[in-house]
């Protein structure tokens, strides 16, 4: 089931197909939730979570869940410091709570024992700081998780290989074919303890005030994902969140790992 990935916004398709949202790829037409919003920074991720939860409860009631779900929660992109829009902190709190509500629902359901949730960013480059900006977020959530972290280099193709191995799927390309599944996160026995979502301490209704960064943000395109200039937006976010802390500038590092047998 697809929730928001490669989906046209409602205004682009409503008059054509009579549905609010539709997958842009033919393979997604019959598997996309017509009620789940795609990228739109004026829509809360709580709204997206509400739609997902409504469908999930139906799956629980009927005792059947799709083998693979792709769920897009885009509000961690933020709208920079745009006046009147949620602050970056509020957007992130919204994003975190939506994810937490999804994990809570799965972990309290009969599907928890047989479900793994993989959390990644849509892009493997992030704002620059003291760490190479090609790094990205990866969270593996399941009843079979070992506590702690796995200390090894993981690429996006490794994540795909992990999902393919769990689902019993063939590789999509030579890249994920040679990916190394992240088996080290899983334990021999499950821990069925459910998760309860934590309400953010940040006010999710907090709005950006007028500021020099608000004027800069007004010049950026937030209508599409990643349409805003990266460097400009990163500097705006840094100033908004860090204040007078010096901007670190981009860090680039050669990434490699010696793989021994």
Question: What is each residue range found by the language model?
Answer:
Residues 1-261:
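N-terminal pro-sequences and low-complexity stem/linker regions of secreted or lumenal proteins
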């Amino acid at each position: 089931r697809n929730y928001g990935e490669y989906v046209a916004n409602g205004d682009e398709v409503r008059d054509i197909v009579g549905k609010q949202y539709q997958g842009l790829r033919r393979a997604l037409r019959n598997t996309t939730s017509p009620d789940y919003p795609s990228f739109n920074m004026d829509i809360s991720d709580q709204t997206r979570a509400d739609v997902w939860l409504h469908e999930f409860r139906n799956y629980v009631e009927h005792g059947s869940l799709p083998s693979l779900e792709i769920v897009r929660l885009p509000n961690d992109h933020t709208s920079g410091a745009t006046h009147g829009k949620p602050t970056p902190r509020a957007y992130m709190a919204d994003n975190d709570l939506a994810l937490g509500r999804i994990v809570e629902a799965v972990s309290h359901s009969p599907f928890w024992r047989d479900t793994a949730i993989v959390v990644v960013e849509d892009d493997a480059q992030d704002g620059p700081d003291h760490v190479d900006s090609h790094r990205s977020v990866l969270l593996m959530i399941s009843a079979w998780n070992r506590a702690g972290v796995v200390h090894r280099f993981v690429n996006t193709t490794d994540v795909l290989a992990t999902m393919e191995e769990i689902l019993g799927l063939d590789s999509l390309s030579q890249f994920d074919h040679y990916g190394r599944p992240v088996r080290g996160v899983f334990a021999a026995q499950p821990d069925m303890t459910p998760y309860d979502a934590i309400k953010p301490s940040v006010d999710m209704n907090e709005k950006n005030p007028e500021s020099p960064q608000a004027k800069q943000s007004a010049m950026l395109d937030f209508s599409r994902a990643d349409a805003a200039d990266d460097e400009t937006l990163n500097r705006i976010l840094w100033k908004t969140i860090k204040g007078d802390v010096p901007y670190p500038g981009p860090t680039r590092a050669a990434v490699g790992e010696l793989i021994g047998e």
